[in-house]
Design a protein with these regions (language model features):
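Short amphipathic alpha-helix that is part of the acyltransferase structural core
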Residues: 1-39, 47-61, 152-176
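Conserved acidic functional residues
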Residues: 13, 118-119
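Short, solvent-exposed loop/turn elements at beta->coil junctions and helix N-caps
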Residues: 38-44, 134-136
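Conserved beta-strand in the GNAT
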Residues: 52-54, 60-70, 76-84
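Conserved acetyl-CoA pyrophosphate-binding loop and the N-cap/start of the following alpha-helix
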Residues: 89-101, 111
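Conserved GNAT acetyl-CoA-binding A-motif
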Residues: 104-118, 131
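Conserved catalytic-core motifs of GNAT/GCN5-like acyltransferases
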Residues: 117, 129-151
């Protein structure tokens, strides 16, 4: 019988979890993932720790999602990703649970807009739509730049930020 997401414990990622999560990302994504444009926006920037979540089953990491602060047109934006589910848990709804939880928590701590780079048919079920006029660093396909929240009148390049330029609710954990 298949597992259900109810059997999974959802917690906030801690600094001690960093390498375990990195190993999951390495397992789930192609080699060279760090060369992607989103990684350039994350370099040297603390993640939004309240939105970096882990899903564990019996203490074993089954899924993870991270969120990073960026800016578009001078406004704070939460950049979602990576999100990964261990191959033995794919198809159980765990990725969707992580995304819905991040959207809910982000709203409650004051993030007005979230974005990600991903597959529109998949992320559209959570309310994400294509962000016309929002430009990720190349080589990002503009059809994969998606957002949710208050994007009215906001366009421009997605820029890397330092922790001091993020909303007050941001409390990034230290990676050292």
């Amino acid at each position: 019988m298949g597992r259900t997401v109810q059997e999974v414990n959802l917690t906030q990622e801690q600094a001690a979890d960093w390498w375990e999560v990195e190993a999951l990302f390495d397992l789930c994504f192609a080699p060279g993932r760090e060369a992607l444009s989103s990684y350039r926006l994350r370099d040297g920037v603390a993640p939004v720790s309240q939105l970096c979540l882990l899903a564990r089953e019996n203490g074993i990491l089954a899924g993870a999602i991270r969120v990073w602060p960026v800016r578009v047109a001078g406004r704070p934006v939460a950049l979602i990703g990576p999100v990964a589910v261990h191959p033995t848990h794919q198809g159980e709804g765990l990725g969707g649970m992580l995304i819905r939880e991040v959207i809910d928590r982000a709203h409650h701590i004051g993030w007005e807009r979230l974005m990600l780079v991903g597959d529109a048919p998949y992320y559209g079920r959570f309310g994400f739509t294509r962000l016309d006029g929002v430009e990720m660093p190349p080589p990002t396909n503009p059809d994969r730049v998606l957002g949710i929240g208050d994007w009215d009148g906001i366009s421009g390049k997605v820029l890397r930020v330092a922790g001091a330029n993020t909303p007050p609710a941001h409390q990034g954990f230290k990676l050292s």
